[in-house]
Amino acid sequence: MSVSKKDVEYVAELARLSFSEEQKEGFMEDLNSILGYVDKLSELDTDNVDIIVNPYYIENKFREDEVEESMDLKDVIKNAPKNLEEYIVVPKIID
């Protein structure tokens, strides 16, 4: 499997990025190099290799949710730069 210029353009379009032709060629070469390395790794025989386990036990540290008193709505609205009744108005960020 190889990455074509069209693939690079498609991913750039999805990410809403624009690149020069030279940059597209560079990305295409880099991605093809990475995929070549992955292909080499897939050729390795790992049937007789022991499973590697992380020696450190990692555990999520969760805390109990505790209800705390929050600011009064009037104070929140008073500190907001712009409001519409009980709502804070923010700039639109998504088209």
UniProtKB/Swiss-Prot annotation:
InterPro entries according to UniProt: Asp/Glu-ADT_sf_sub_c (IPR036113), GatC (IPR003837)
Catalyzed reactions: L-glutamyl-tRNA(Gln) + L-glutamine + ATP + H2O = L-glutaminyl-tRNA(Gln) + L-glutamate + ADP + phosphate + H(+); L-aspartyl-tRNA(Asn) + L-glutamine + ATP + H2O = L-asparaginyl-tRNA(Asn) + L-glutamate + ADP + phosphate + 2 H(+)
Any Pfam family hit: GatC
Annotated GO biological process: glutaminyl-tRNAGln biosynthesis via transamidation; regulation of translational fidelity; translation
Enzyme class: ligase
Top-level taxon in the UniProt lineage: Bacteria
Keywords (A to Z) from UniProt: ATP-binding, Ligase, Nucleotide-binding, Protein biosynthesis
EC number: 6.3.5.-
Family recorded in the similarity comment: Belongs to the GatC family.
Cited HAMAP family: GatC
Function of the protein: Allows the formation of correctly charged Asn-tRNA(Asn) or Gln-tRNA(Gln) through the transamidation of misacylated Asp-tRNA(Asn) or Glu-tRNA(Gln) in organisms which lack either or both of asparaginyl-tRNA or glutaminyl-tRNA synthetases. The reaction takes place in the presence of glutamine and ATP through an activated phospho-Asp-tRNA(Asn) or phospho-Glu-tRNA(Gln).
Complex and partners: Heterotrimer of A, B and C subunits.
Protein name, per record: Glutamyl-tRNA(Gln) amidotransferase subunit C 1
Lineage per the UniProt record: Bacteria, Bacillati, Bacillota, Clostridia, Eubacteriales
Gene behind the chain: gatC1
